[in-house]
Amino acid sequence: VASSEAKAFLANIQVDDSVNAPGSGPVLIGAIPFDSQQPHDFVLPKLLVCKSDDGRCWVTTIQDTELDKSESIDLDLGPIHAPSATSSSYTVTPGVDIETYLHAVTAARDAVRSGAITKAVIARDVFVTSSQPIDIHSVLLRLRNSFGSSYQFSVDGFVGASPELLVSIVDGEVSSHPLAGTAPRTGDPATDAQLATSLLSSTKNQIEHRIVIDAVHDTLLPWCSYLDWEPEASIVAVANVQHLGTHMLGRLSEPFLHVLDAVYALSPTPALGGHPRDKALKLIAEVEGMSRGRYGGDGICRSKSR
């Protein structure tokens, strides 16, 4: 489904949803690129096997004709095998050369110092080539083991895990959990606690975090009857790093904002692009030396029922 047609396509589906839970009903799945103006599509799976946090399970099917409820659905998914270890070798090569990267960092620094922008996030790419086909199932299991509290995803070869919730809308309630400001984790509890304390007290990281919070709040507020956030940031720890995070919760005014419109309005946040957004993105496009593609974009899962 083309992104420009996604809302209308979903709205025109006739739904028989006896589960009536977040995520039930037809679900569009996709990844919005860092530059959301680039062409991108969403997928409507014909078969979804779902499980909620409270243990409920259900199956969603997409049919061209009405399904007789007395019919049974044959879930012949075949045997599910745990991934096995491979003897693959890997070659790591840089994408953008170090000179281009350092030039981009210098350009961003100078733009901030001159007052042209408040922030810009510069990235560089690395290519890892395997001697054997990469088992995505194995990658996802590793991500689940290491980043179990994060959102794991696999969309058409775009695989990862993120602890950040850009935006969720359920029955008119809007929530977001932006992250910005980061410190490493070492695996030693005492050292990590010290790093977390330093992160919370860091003026630089608190400013960086507040830029993101203000941007998300100011973007969503025109659609809300109220929108509030936690008075202080908290630590969100994952396997290798820890972030500053702030939960945001509000109520949408009617007519309710569509979650796709919210995603496009928010993305990319200053945590991944910069601020002001248009100026920062223009600088990134001029100096970064690569196309980010879906990196730094957003994974999205949209259910019609919610």
Regions picked out by a protein language model, each given a short descriptive name:
Residues 1, 24-59, 130-182, 227-251, ...:
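Conserved, well-ordered active-site substructure
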Residues 1-5, 71-106, 110, 124, ...:
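Contiguous alpha-helical scaffold segments within structured protein domains
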Residues 5-127, 225:
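Non-catalytic accessory segments adjacent to catalytic cores
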